[in-house]
């Protein structure tokens, strides 16, 4: 049995930026403090939502180190360290671990899609380079590559491969992974609209975008489930759906950064090639925030 890196709601945190595109570390610190105050169970820095794909390594590592220092062991810090270049990924994994991250989030290789055997070799090499627990990230809608349940089983035998963030949207696949891997691979939902279904299959929590705007909602949903109050968990899951829909009306993190700006945070804009949402989608996002009581005007 592998102890989970965290249990509950981890936030896939945004990276706030100034007008010139540089990281606004002061605002990042304020957002982290607010997340912890609202009982977020883990901070995931430099993931998809954090725009790691447009960060050079030195900037990414600076964001990881800053987050580790601000969090100061209050909750686990999970650092995005994925790459479609295994050698580069190994170097990034090692340096992220040196920054003090508690675990690494590693996406499957993208564009130069490999085979299932290649996935085993890739994740094994990167896990051993990092030397700390790894959560694999399966998001075939972005990468064009799926981690098959049988591959998850093989990788779960490695002592450092601790979990999988499952964002395939395929509940049947998640069930198969749970059946094959049991307690040797901790499953986290990568979709805010599928938190309770994955918990019901033995999942340990969610890596959430919605947590950026309403962390207590996602935390309370997970807590209710683990406390045995499935009716409340179901209610909170359904309450989450309008926010989840709005925050994915365009490619993540475009909507969530806009939402954070509306809520008064200095989130800034996304780096190109991502641009701000359309006017229609801005209205849609604001409507969802208003319905949840997050804005009143």
Set out the residue ranges of the language-model regions.
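Alpha-helical structural signal in soluble globular domains
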Residues: 62, 66-71, 95, 99, ...
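Short, flexible micro-motifs
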Residues: 11, 15, 24, 50-53, ...
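Catalytic alpha/beta core domains of metabolic enzymes, predominantly
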Residues: 128, 142-248
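Short secondary-structure transition/capping segments
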Residues: 55-58, 91, 116-119, 147-149, ...
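C-terminal alpha-helical cap/extension of soluble enzyme domains
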Residues: 5-16, 34, 38-40, 200-203, ...
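Active-site beta->alpha loop and helix N-cap motifs at the rims of alpha/beta catalytic domains
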Residues: 2-11, 15-144
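Glycine-rich phosphate-binding "P-loop"
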Residues: 138, 160-161, 271-272
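A general structural signal for well-ordered alpha-helical segments in protein cores
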Residues: 28, 60, 64, 89, ...
């Amino acid at each position: 049995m592998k102890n989970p890196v965290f249990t509950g709601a981890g936030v896939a945190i945004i990276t706030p930026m100034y007008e010139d595109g540089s990281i606004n570390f002061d605002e990042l610190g304020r957002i982290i403090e607010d997340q912890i105050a609202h009982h977020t169970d883990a901070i995931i820095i430099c993931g998809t939502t954090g725009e790691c794909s447009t960060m050079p390594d030195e900037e990414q590592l600076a964001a990881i180190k800053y987050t580790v220092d601000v969090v100061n062991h209050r909750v686990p810090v999970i650092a995005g360290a994925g790459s479609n270049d295994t050698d580069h990924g190994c170097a990034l994994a090692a340096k992220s671990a040196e920054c003090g991250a508690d675990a690494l989030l590693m996406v499957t290789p993208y564009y130069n899609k490999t085979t299932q055997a290649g996935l085993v070799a890739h994740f094994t090499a990167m896990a051993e380079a990092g030397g700390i627990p790894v959560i694999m990230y399966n998001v075939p809608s972005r990468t064009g590559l799926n981690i098959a349940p049988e591959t998850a089983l093989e990788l779960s035998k490695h002592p450092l491969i601790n979990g999988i963030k499952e964002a395939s949207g395929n509940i049947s696949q998640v069930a198969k992974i749970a059946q094959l891997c049991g307690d040797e691979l901790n499953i986290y939902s990568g979709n805010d609209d599928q938190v309770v279904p994955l918990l019901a299959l033995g999942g340990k929590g969610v890596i959430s975008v919605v947590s950026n705007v309403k962390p207590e909602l996602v935390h309370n949903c997970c807590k209710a489930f683990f406390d045995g109050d499935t009716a409340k968990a179901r209610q909170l899951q359904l309450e989450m759906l309008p926010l989840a829909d709005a925050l994915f009306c365009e490619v993540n993190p475009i909507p969530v950064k806009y939402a954070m700006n509306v809520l008064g945070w200095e989130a800034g804009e996304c780096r190109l090639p991502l641009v701000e949402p359309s006017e229609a989608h801005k209205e849609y996002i604001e409507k969802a925030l208003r319905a949840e009581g997050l804005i009143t005007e």
